[in-house]
Amino acid sequence: MKQAAWMGWLTIALACAAPMAHADDAQPWSKAKAEAWYAKQAWPVGSNYVPSDAINELEMWQAASFDPARIDQELGWAQGMGINTMRVFLHNLLWEQDKDGFKKRIDTFLSIAAKHHIKPIFVLFDSCWDPDPVLGPQHPPIPGVHNSGWVQAPGTKVLDDPSHYPQLEDYVKDIVGSFAHDERILAWDVWNEPDNDGGGNYAAEEPKDKFQRVAQLLPQVFAWARSQSPVQPLTSGVWHDADWSNLSKLNAVERTQLTESDIISFHNYDFPEIFASRVQQLRGYGRPMICTEYMARSAGSTIDTITPLGKKLDVGMINWGFVSGKTQTIFPWDSWQRPYTLQPPVIWFHDLLQPDGTPYRQREADILRALSRAPKGVVPDAATLFPTAMAVH
């Protein structure tokens, strides 16, 4: 009788606990949980990564063009520079085309990355560049043009038709769910620059109500990903507007990004003083921070100045571009209006390495390596603008 009573109470307790656990999973991490997660990580430092022989995320991941040998070589170069994370873009069309094969290739990538002590951040959706992604062979780069083949996810056809949204839900739940407990992954970036109008020369192809559709879809994407109870944090990075400190002054997409993210991420391609002010604006949210896009040399955002500042402020730092290749992001954004076909830019815009693995500037590689070896928040002398070893006597 006592055992039966005890079992009855246990059944009631479990029944009561289950909805509570489910409710917790449906909410962003507590600030304490986010801080505890960050405390266990190395200071995140890396690049936005696509292999140099891929023009976009489709060419990176499709079975016919997936190149593990090149990825292994390039991530080996990254390891030698002290890089411990890479931000890597996925695509819903890849999952629709070949669910099992796509997940196997993700697993292969993760195995290669783990071999080089790199934990990637995977990006599920992206609102930038070509709004009409098409599977199969990708077009060659447009000469002299920045990111001339990058594609959005989802594309206009899907975004414009809510009947496709259940398939997007299945994609998010399957990808996140399949790797929800995989410690080789650092985080999930659910949507890159969701309220970006696209960029490039694609304005006529963008939905007129793109912002409204994304604003409605983004909270659902967070919910779909969170329903899989991943051990990795979710995030989506704010990237524009003058002040991120006051939610009431931000648009609906930005409010979702800042209130639904487990850790805060942001993009900044400005001078050091502006970068520092952006970090200060985001401090009030009380969560760990990663700058998931920076470094535009000719715009004032450099490895020499911004990366040590991020380290001092204990902000993870992920620059745009690793090996110069088919994305052509050594060319600046204005190349869409003025292609660099006659001569290269005076200074590379993005990217760290030549195609053969030689650093564009050895000093940048030295700074990244020195910063990655130092404790969080510590900028070693070797990473300062004028290290003692370089002093002129």
Question: What are the residue ranges of the model-derived segments?
Answer:
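Active-site mouth of glycoside hydrolases
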Residues: 25-261, 267, 272-274, 285, ...
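Cleavable N-terminal signal peptides
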Residues: 10-11, 21
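Extended, alpha-helix-rich binding/interface surfaces that flank or overlap catalytic cores
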Residues: 331-391
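Low-complexity, Gly/Pro
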Residues: 23, 122, 390-393
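Bacterial N-terminal signal peptides that target proteins for export
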Residues: 1-9
